[in-house]
Amino acid sequence: MEAPRSGTYLPAGYAPQYPPAAVQGPPEHTGRPTFQTNYQVPQSGYPGPQASYTVSTSGHEGYAATRLPIQNNQTIVLANTQWMPAPPPILNCPPGLEYLNQIDQLLIHQQVELLEVLTGFETNNKFEIKNSLGQMVYVAVEDTDCCTRNCCEASRPFTLRILDHLGQEVMTLERPLKCSSCCFPCCLQEIEIQAPPGVPIGYVTQTWHPCLPKLTLQNDKRENVLKVVGPCVACTCCSDIDFEIKSLDEVTRIGKITKQWSGCVKEAFTDSDNFGIQFPLDLEVKMKAVTLGACFLIDYMFFEGCE
């Protein structure tokens, strides 16, 4: 087993991740989805991770060449980044999501944008998605035009592209424009998760409640699978905030999404946030991806622009 990297931060309640061969899945939980069988086996020879990047594209230092329509003002620096080793192909798993089969914890770190800190000019968000050992699993890059970002701010519609170690887009998250006021339950928030891009595998929809933030995780047929329930006050000072992942009857807790406290200075002057996700190891891979989408929706709904 590879030791954690020096400086790797694990939030409270998150145990170190063990090799898949040494871990058995947790007991069954109420409301757990089952595996589907409509995906083909990815081709063998899936390329392994790279220790660093030497190929750059215009405006995207550190990435292999890609044709993604990402805004040119973004700069992503990932030189000398340690990536999670590429797992073997898995039956009935969307290409690029094999990593999630070996993971029961994810850490999401939003990059601090100096331009945004100094000028208040809203830029496209960029996130690092790591496992509990600090190894990079994915990178998430927002793709939104300047006018939309600065006019709609946290309520803006966006496309979030999830890239692997080769710079290939393995997931796409689409959030439509909807009124974010809690007084209008007819305009509840939602996000669509696609893997591969263009193929919906699930949705996250807001469930109206007068006091609590609630989300419903759905499969590709829009059938309800899991619930996410947050605290009455989603913004607290000097402490982590837990959004519990529960069964549909909200009785059994199977995981959580944690907004981690980043310190007074970072919280006060930036909207750069850190999150942790914990879910069962044997949860269906596509529902793990939908849970990741729920984390990003929570960030934009409750914490984006809260500095």
Curated annotation (Swiss-Prot):
**Lipid attachment site numbers (S-palmitoyl cysteine):** 182-183, 186-187
Any matching Pfam family: Scramblase
Q: Where in the cell is it found?
A: Membrane
Q: Which UniProt keywords apply?
A: Calcium, Lipoprotein, Membrane, Metal-binding, Palmitate, Phosphoprotein, Repeat, SH3-binding, Transmembrane, Transmembrane helix
Instruction: Kindly state which reaction or reactions the protein catalyses.
Output: a 1,2-diacyl-sn-glycero-3-phosphocholine(in) = a 1,2-diacyl-sn-glycero-3-phosphocholine(out)
Query: Which GO cellular component does the record give, naming just one?
Result: membrane
- Which residue stretches are annotated as topological domain Cytoplasmic? 1-286
Q: Which residues cross the membrane?
A: 287-303
Q: Which processes are annotated in GO (biological process)? A: cellular response to lipopolysaccharide; plasma membrane phospholipid scrambling
User: Taking the first listed entry, what is the main subcellular location of this protein, grouped into a coarse class?
Assistant: membrane
Q: Could you tell me what this protein does?
A: May catalyze calcium-induced ATP-independent rapid bidirectional and non-specific movement of phospholipids (lipid scrambling or lipid flip-flop) between the inner and outer leaflet of the plasma membrane.
In which family does this protein belong, per the annotation?
Belongs to the phospholipid scramblase family.
> What name goes with this protein?
Phospholipid scramblase 2
Say which species the protein is native to. Mus musculus (Mouse)
